[in-house]
Amino acid sequence: MKPVQLTIDGRSVSVSPELSILEAARLNDISIPTLCFHEALAERGSCWLCIVELKGQNRFIPACNTKVSEGMVVETDNAELRGMRRQSLERIIDQHCGDCLGPCEISCPAGCNIPGFVSAIATGRDRDAMAIIMETIPLPGILGRVCPAPCEDACRRHGVDDPVSICALKRFAADRDAAAPEPFMPERKVGSGKKVAIVGAGPGGLTAAYYLLAAGHGVTIIDAHEQPGGMMRYGIPRFRLPAEVIESDIRPIREMGAEFMMSTSFGSDTDWTTLSRDHDSLLLSVGASVAARMGIPGEDAPGVVSGIEFLKRAAEGDAGEAGKTVIVIGGGNTAVDAARTALRLGAESVTIMYRRSLEEMPANSLEIGEASAEGVELRLLTAPTEICSDPEGLLVRAVEMRLGEPGVDGRRRPIAVEGSDFVLKADLVIAATGQAVQVPASGLPGLGIRQDGTVMVDEVSMQTELPGVFACGDCVSGPELAILAVGQGRRAAQAIDRFLTGLPFEKPPAVFNSSYGERDHAPAPFYERAKPASRVDVPELSPSERRRSFEEAVTGYGREDAVSEARRCLQCRCRAIDSCHLRELAGEFGITSSMESRPDGEFAIDGTQGARFEREKCVDCGICVRTLEQASSGTADFRVLIESCPTGAISG
């Protein structure tokens, strides 16, 4: 059959007259969007995304259903076509309902594929679980113990019974791997010959080091402490985070060749001028290790110590005895850690004094509960006004508080109750009312510093005002969670890698994300389909066993418990997220979200026939129906249906 000549986007092409415009375009590497087209099917759908313009005829036609003809002039892309396609896509998206990413994954500052590693544990694939975790969190043993788990707050399992113990499962994977004959090591690219200096051996700096080393770059880590780990080592007590766990997480970084310059203060012992002689870039990742002042008389009296200093001395084995009576001032994790540490150092009475209510205490609620179980007393709505030296120790003058109107931060302001003054005696007062960043700017002349003392960086590149100098972690965000520093460390490593390889910095493209919305907003049948199963308790020492011991208080899951807990996961993450054509097209057309999506009809997930069909994700493209109709037997292999579904409505 004689070929026909036509013009597509100004290009003259010669094709068989049996082809559609869409097939002719694809044959010539011209892309036309479509959801309902499948090359193996004779019958076509009607998504109207493949609409094109016939020039000279002022006609808009579907490219998948229109045969080519001699002399045809086709335009596949212009502003009018894009507008029409976007309208069609928005109509289709309105029919599509479900979560692209699980709420747990969205809430994780590091962006960890939580459903992925939990599923791997549930099916006994420990190595796969570790590999998935290490894609975003290279310190899993540490974070599996100390992360406050915003992911668990977001877990949709709340709508059934209790959230999945995500952190404990991450710890399980890390501990299993650490005990394996050959622990996980990432594949490392060929050496680039480039070298990066990292100032700070805390979560952000270690994370950046891990990914830069894996990318083939050399890394030198500079830190003022004797050992790496930053506040994870010197600010978190050993009964929560054993030193051997820190070493286990750092092992891959050492084995990939990182150089450590410990007991080295940046700015006094070395600076960027010196380091730049044999380093191509620098990352500043210092933590918030300076104690905030309380602003009351007597806070510098003998017997008053900051929470940071107290925990550091305890980590170094130099804290001495705490005395019989200890008062800790503050309500964060440092305050709770200091109180629990004081008990283990022999204190008979430990009191946490906090100026707001229990609901507003920023410390992890689990840690507060464990402290209370060990015998720590909470004196809430109480604030110190003065600390005085006394022949028998210290006197803490305090006042009762009430909560007033919300301040600029949205929190209700504590107000002193007139005439409520009282005095408490103490042998030791630990001040843990906050932390601040002290950037070693003397080592980086010209570094831009904000009024709050944090470093100014470009939001996209994380580069400072100094070329080749980047920053991440607390020195950028202010005092924050370790998991946030991990997320920033990975982003910084990616940006530095682009800098070292000469690639331009690029803002990540906006990605479409369909979601049922907030944690409890999925359709009722979504929760009802799950069988109730109580959260598996994480084994721990009893309060009487642990209150005088620095042995790790929480002992962690064994295999049976871990698998049982992992199987509670609802697997909210779409199974087709990496191959969803609808998500890809939505991103191309700048449609970034479909929040609070709801099924038009009855919610249904059917997994009884060997494949899983989720009706609410179906956009009626018709590919599966046409596949079955075209098959001579009226049946088709599920794998064919799964691979051809453009939205993940059919999955394995």
PLM regions: where:
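Glycine-rich dinucleotide-binding loop and its adjacent helix/turn
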Residues: A173-K189, S248-S268, A291-L345, R450-V460, ...
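Ferredoxin-type iron-sulfur electron-transfer modules and their immediate structural context
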Residues: M1-K195, A243, L282-D300, S389-G393, ...
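Residue-level detector of alpha-helix initiation sites
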Residues: P138, G202-P203, Q227, G332-T334, ...
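A conserved short coil-to-beta-strand element within the FAD-binding core of flavoproteins
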Residues: M262-T273, L381-E392
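Rossmann-like dinucleotide-binding cores of NAD(P)H-dependent redox enzymes
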Residues: G218-I221, H225-M256, F260, K312-A314, ...
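FAD-site-proximal beta/loop scaffold in flavoenzymes
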Residues: D300-G323, D409-P479
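N-terminal Rossmann-like FAD-binding beta1-loop-alpha1 element of flavoenzymes
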Residues: V196-G218, A335-L343
